[in-house]
């Protein structure tokens, strides 16, 4: 039973309300159905009941939308997660009033449970004074209880809606924050990608800059290299131009080709002896007609080549130029010379001691030329000699040609090539012609009183079968027809000029033919036969001038000058190399230099040794053209 209170009594003193709200709260926590329906019913109930609760004309001051009711707050605190379920429970409560009443009755019987709820209602709702306290306490007014339940449900619904709105706002805020975070995350990723792209672009740009710098540096280096190459090309062009200019200035003369017939050589030798005879007669005041003989004497050469008669020149070339050619020939001839023992043996020249020397070959030659010309008016002295004995002239001519044969033998030494023989013949003839021209321009008038000694010292050999010299009658008649002073003057001039000529010829011919294997004896024959005079010291010791044999025919001169042998250590090194390379025994220039350094020999000695070794040390082969190295391959005049 509820206690009855006075109307003036405050609601907080002893007012007790039925524990319907507590039951409803418990039911709200247990019901989970019909969310939307309950909410709509609450709105309808609120619209019907109004804003304030009037119980029996008394304004209780309770508003279902007041934010200060503790019941709604309690429900909000307990039902944050189940707002919709509370609305459904309210609907169930509205529909089942009888059950609620029963529950209220049951709750009234348990005051302990209702004390807390009543206190909360007293705090929130204020004092509720009613004139019908007994009826209210007794629970007879069912309408008032329904209203209270409706207001409480409405308050609960409002609180639930507010909670829902708050939750929705929180959810929206959370979603917005999440979206902002996601957007910031997206933007940060994009920024990172942009930064990475910028870094890649910068790295590519730096690489491109480095490549451009490398290309520029390579271009600079290429330009510098091209500039250097252009400078080298210009220098090479200058060198080529200079070398071509020097080559044109030092171009070697073409060899003078002589005819192969012995008559051509004899004719050239005739002209040489004619020049000698004419040189002996240049300064005779009474023999002016002999000058015509000088003008008529011509050197017979091949039709395509002519020798100029100017002093010191041959074919437009200077004397020094021709002597340099002869020096080249000398160096070439050393390539053929051998250092072996069989070449050191003396070579004997066959001779016939039954013939006395012909003392007047020059006059015989002069007489022969006068017989060929038949100029009786211009050559009176020679014609007087020719009228006495024609046989003497013929014999003298034969003797002369025989003596010239030794010259042909000396000149016409046949090396391995025809060109070399032509070169030697041309060089010898050019050298002789130079000295004859020199002697023509340098005639002297020195006096010597040894005319008879000169004729006795003239040495010459003749291969004719006559034992008596055929020139004596003509020589005597020639001497008888001339005055003594003229004969003496002529003999003095002849002796002086021939001595000068012989000395100069001996110096040049011996140098050009000293290193040749076959030219030493032939050059000595050339001196003895052509020039026909020796010094008094060269005669034999017995004092017999008629039986004097020329110095070139003695054994000491005929014997070849012995060459020095190479050291045994050097030859052993060279032989070792030769036997190791016997299939191709031709060392290169670098190998020759190396061998020369190792053996302490000269480059020329190495060349000579290998040329001899290929001929004598290695076995001979049939084809020498293939096996042997060609002569004058490096210093040929034709190059």
Curated annotation (Swiss-Prot):
Name of the protein this chain belongs to: Homeobox protein 9
CDD domains: homeodomain (cd00086)
InterPro entries, A to Z: HD, Homeodomain-like_sf, TALE_homeobox
Localization of this protein: Nucleus
Biased composition (Basic and acidic residues): 345-354
Record-level Gene Ontology MF annotations: DNA-binding transcription factor activity, RNA polymerase II-specific; RNA polymerase II cis-regulatory region sequence-specific DNA binding
GO biological process: cell development; positive regulation of gene expression; regulation of adenylate cyclase-activating G protein-coupled receptor signaling pathway; regulation of transcription by RNA polymerase II
Domain of life: Eukaryota
Bias kind Polar residues: ranges: 405-422, 532-547
Coiled coil spans: 72-109, 152-184, 230-296, 365-396
DNA-binding region location: 559-621
Species assigned in the record: Dictyostelium discoideum (Social amoeba)
Function: Putative transcription factor.
GO CC terms: nucleus
Pfam families reported in the protein's UniProt record: Homeodomain
Annotated region described as Disordered, given as residue ranges: 1-45, 66-144, 157-179, 262-313, 331-422, 436-547
Stretches with biased composition (Low complexity): 73-119, 126-142, 266-300, 358-399, 436-526
Keywords (A to Z) from UniProt: Coiled coil, Developmental protein, DNA-binding, Homeobox, Nucleus, Transcription, Transcription regulation
Gene3D superfamilies the record matches: Homeodomain-like
PROSITE patterns per record: HOMEOBOX_2 (PS50071)
């Amino acid at each position: 039973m509820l206690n009855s209170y006075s109307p003036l009594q405050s609601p907080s003193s002893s007012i007790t309300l039925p524990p319907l709200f507590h039951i409803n709260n418990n039911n709200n926590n247990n019901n989970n159905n019909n969310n939307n329906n309950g909410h709509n019913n609450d709105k309808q109930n609120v619209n019907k009941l109004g804003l304030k609760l009037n119980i029996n004309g008394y304004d209780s001051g309770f508003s279902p939308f007041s934010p200060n009711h503790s019941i709604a707050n309690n429900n909000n605190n307990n039902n944050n997660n189940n707002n919709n379920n509370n609305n459904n429970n309210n609907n169930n409560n509205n529909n089942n009033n009888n059950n609620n009443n029963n529950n209220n009755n049951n709750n009234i019987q348990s005051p302990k449970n209702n004390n807390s709820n009543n206190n909360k209602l007293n705090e929130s709702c204020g004092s509720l004074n009613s004139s019908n306290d007994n009826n209210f306490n007794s629970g007879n007014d069912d309408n008032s209880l329904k209203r209270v339940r409706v207001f409480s449900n409405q308050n609960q619904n409002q609180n639930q809606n507010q909670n829902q709105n708050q939750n929705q706002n929180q959810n929206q805020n959370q979603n917005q924050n999440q979206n902002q975070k996601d957007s910031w995350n997206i933007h940060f990723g994009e920024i990172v990608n942009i930064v990475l792209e910028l870094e890649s672009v910068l790295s590519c740009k730096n690489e491109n800059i480095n490549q451009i710098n490398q290309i520029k540096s390579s271009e600079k280096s290429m330009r510098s290299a091209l500039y250097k190459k252009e400078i080298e090309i210009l220098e090479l062009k200058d060198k080529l131009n200079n070398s071509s200019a020097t080559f044109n200035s030092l171009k070697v003369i073409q060899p003078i080709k002589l005819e192969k017939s012995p008559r051509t050589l004899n004719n050239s030798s005739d002209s040489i002896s004619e020049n000698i005879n004419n040189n002996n007669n240049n300064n005779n005041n009474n023999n002016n007609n002999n000058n015509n003989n000088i003008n008529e004497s011509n050197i017979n050469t091949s039709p395509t080549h002519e020798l100029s008669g100017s002093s010191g020149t041959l074919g437009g070339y200077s004397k020094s130029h021709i002597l340099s050619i002869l020096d080249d020939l000398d160096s070439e001839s050393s390539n053929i010379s051998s250092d072996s023992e069989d070449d050191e043996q003396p070579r004997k020249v066959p001779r016939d001691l039954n013939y006395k020397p012909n003392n007047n070959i020059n006059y015989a030659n002069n007489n022969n030329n006068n017989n060929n010309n038949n100029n009786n008016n211009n050559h009176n002295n020679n014609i007087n000699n020719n009228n006495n004995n024609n046989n003497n002239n013929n014999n003298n001519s034969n003797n002369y040609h025989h003596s010239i044969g030794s010259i042909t033998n000396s000149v016409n030494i046949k090396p391995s090539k025809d060109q070399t023989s032509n070169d030697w013949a041309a060089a010898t003839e050019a050298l002789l012609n130079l000295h004859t021209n020199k002697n023509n321009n340098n005639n002297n008038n020195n006096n010597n009183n040894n005319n008879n000694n000169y004729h006795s010292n003239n040495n010459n050999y003749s291969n004719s079968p006559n034992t008596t010299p055929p020139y004596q009658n003509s020589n005597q008649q020639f001497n008888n027809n001339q005055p003594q002073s003229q004969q003496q003057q002529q003999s003095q001039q002849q002796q002086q000029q021939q001595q000068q000529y012989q000395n100069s010829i001996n110096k040049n011919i011996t140098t050009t033919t000293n290193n040749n294997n076959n030219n030493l004896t032939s050059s000595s024959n050339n001196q003895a036969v052509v020039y026909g005079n020796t010094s008094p010291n060269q005669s034999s010791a017995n004092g017999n001038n008629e039986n004097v044999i020329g110095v070139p025919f003695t054994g000491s001169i005929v014997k070849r000058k012995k060459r020095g042998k190479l050291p045994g250590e050097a030859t052993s090194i060279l032989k070792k190399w030769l036997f190791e390379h016997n299939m191709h025994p031709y060392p290169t220039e670098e190998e020759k230099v190396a061998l020369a350094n190792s053996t302490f020999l000269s480059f020329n000695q190495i060349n000579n040794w290998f040329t001899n070794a290929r001929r004598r040390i290695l076995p001979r082969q049939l084809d020498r053209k293939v096996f042997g190295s060609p002569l004058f391959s490096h210093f040929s005049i034709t190059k």
